[in-house]
């Protein structure tokens, strides 16, 4: 049985680590300006936006949030002139162009190396312009916080003389796994990638098997999307190594976890990296932060949940990216029918199968295209979460106290232990 946990972010360490504030208090000078830059995926935007809003509310600093124009348009589709900046009274949102402003990009429609090369080139140029514009307008950025797949941000920050810090939006255990992979374990793991039960013992981490590792580390296709993303991770860790060598001190990394859960993992790389666990926001706060790339379903799913008994509903969602095969959909439909439990199932419009039509019409179930996951998990009627076990979903279900049936191996292992 999960309990609701909230551990407040260590804001004082973050502000001091950016070499901005000399104050010993939590409050930052209003002239302190943080720029959050994130990759245009829902799973990246959510934790970055949560932390950005927490920075703004707890430190008094100025905060700007930036992602690509395409994602920005979808976040603010109901506003006029959605390509322009937007201020919600707390944060200013300013987009940058990645060269694909008018396209609903999917990695299946373009060679991954070609896409990331285009993304890097255009984004570097336009983020640099954004930084110049902010400085010219009297709002110079004092620190940049960036998420995964954006290693090029460090170059831009350096050119402008601005300190930058990585916000690792996954688990500390996953960070430790990647760290050790790039520091002596790559050949071993690659050599045994086809042996799921092969034991892997990273320094300071609990024993693992190949099956527990992120799939990016065990995929053997040299030119696929996994290899391209792994190259981006490799660059991130090279940057951290470079910071350590140049400054003769440990680089700082913000990690989306809390000390009490991942004490062992955080200690496993503490000699090389100063990890600052920024915790997870309470459901009351997370509920109020919206930056959705998808339009919320018009079905009144919250009202539907209100009609169900406490802890009776099975909530099913596999994230905003995954696409299920017909056979997988059939298995889930069969399981739902046999469970005789009310269910709320999130299925993308372009992933619907004919089998769903029958089950969607039943009184005990509802199928939606998109919903506010935190609102659903916080509802008294939800008793179980069937999930792909992305880190955001893992933390949200933990905070809301909802048990879950999980998929991603390493996150699932963390939940079990």
Give each language-model segment a name:
Residues 2-417:
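Glycosyltransferase specificity loop/lid
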